[in-house]
């Protein structure tokens, strides 16, 4: 279970700690394999739920950590990571709103800040060697703290399964709520919760009802729709049903409203950064409503070329966030450019929630480029349809010349 040569160079390490099976095993493993190394547990509160934090400090100390730092990042996470990313229109492979991916840079940044505060010379994470998160965390560490050593136990130890980890903890009399029967790997934050593993590893299996934990089954959702109104300023949701709210509070309220209607469920097979495909089920109720509202206002206020540019930026931004490249010059540039475009994304939207769907049914904006007078199919006084003839001749000129040359 250990590495061959015990390390004596690392004096103090900050571990990204959740209290789950993996990180519970990492603390004693570090003590056994890194001589005289002090272990500082760090937990980022990104809205995963109070139940995940209860007793966490005591558990970390009982496992062998000397300190446990729980840092409240909820408001910062929504304000400085979720809102700016959504303003770019980022959505990975057409469906994934990047709930897990967006959380990694803020967690890594806070972990580095704790390391600097306590004078640590190493950072440690519990990401597996098959997943995206190892790249995301270590990419952020490289950008923020290239001088600190990174320890990745899953790439060092010989344990290969949940059963191995459970046996390892049992041998050391370390208690854990994990068990071999808990088959799903879950990751939660204020924006979403992800589910992987178990029967989901076979794409021919429909997800069982036990997979989903945050949203109602659309089949069991209310038979009557619910309407929710959102006010948007500069591409940010500022009010929900007329109530002015902070970014985090707005997201929480939308989660509570949308989840009972089964909104925000997706079941996707995505291309991981490390080359393999993986299947995940994601629940993003409030974020799905926000995304629908922002897109609705963009339809009103962005001209054709601006909207095309925003879609291109959104696609590029989705890959940057998914691939762990938040702290890069390109990401910074795309965020800044999107802020300029978001200055016109203002207005109100009413979203209809019904059995898994979130549909924008009303929208208005003081910056709207839509004119009923110009768009009407009835008799109008502001648009001379004869003007279209000259435009069409110029627009199709290249095609006309090509056809004439071909004769």
From Swiss-Prot:
InterPro entries hit by this protein: Arginosuc_syn_C, Arginosuc_syn_N, Arginosuc_synth, Arginosuc_synth_CS, Arginosuc_synth_type_1_subfam, AS_cat/multimer_dom_body, Rossmann-like_a/b/a_fold
Subunit composition and interactions: Homotetramer.
Family from the record: Belongs to the argininosuccinate synthase family. Type 1 subfamily.
Residues annotated as binding ATP: 16-24, 44, 126
Gene3D superfamilies linked: Argininosuccinate synthetase, chain A, domain 2, HUPs, Single helix bin
Pathway info: Amino-acid biosynthesis; L-arginine biosynthesis; L-arginine from L-ornithine and carbamoyl phosphate: step 2/3
Cellular component, GO annotation: cytoplasm
Subcellular localization, as worded in the UniProt entry: Cytoplasm
Chief localisation class: cytoplasm
Record-given protein name: Argininosuccinate synthase
Gene Ontology biological process terms from the UniProt entry: argininosuccinate metabolic process; L-arginine biosynthetic process; urea cycle
Gene this protein is translated from: argG
Enzyme Commission no: 6.3.4.5
Statement: the UniProt record of this protein carries the keyword ATP-binding: yes
Catalytic activity reported: L-citrulline + L-aspartate + ATP = 2-(N(omega)-L-arginino)succinate + AMP + diphosphate + H(+)
Residue positions binding L-citrulline: 96, 101, 132, 136, 185, 194, 270, 282
Keyword check for Acyltransferase: no
EC supergroup of this enzyme: ligase
Key words of the record: Amino-acid biosynthesis, Arginine biosynthesis, ATP-binding, Cytoplasm, Ligase, Nucleotide-binding
